[in-house]
Amino acid sequence: VGSEMCIRDRDMLSYIKKYPISLFIILTVIYLSFFKPPKTDLDEIPNLDKLVHVCMYLGMSGMLWLEFLRAHRRDNAPIWHAWVGAFLCPVLFSGCVELLQEYCTTYRGGDWLDFAANTTGAVLASLVAYYVVRPRMKINKQ
């Protein structure tokens, strides 16, 4: 049991070393998703929050892609791992956040359009990472 714990600790440390900026962005998105924002004049701009959602998830997914591609330039990690970790996980994470906002807070509500905006951000980041960044980093794994 002791050696298993040591291996798990090492694996966790490995993720922190490979994805430090992504982890910071994820924590920031969690904070922004659950804090009670003050009322401002910006609330009057229609759908500004949707643009913020696109940007948050574009940033999260994009950084996950960049850090994956950088960390796995020289090994045989299949590219589908990036699709799961940098696209699917942020989309599922987004859905969980929307459900938690709806059912576990009194000052936030889940919103299908927020989920769609979050997914749009992850899609945009993934397309740019796969078709623009990955070829430039010479990552050609299927």
Predicted segments — roles?
Residues V1-I7:
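Short, small-residue-biased leader/transition segments that mark boundaries at the very start
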Residues D11-F115, T119-Q142:
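Bulky hydrophobic segments
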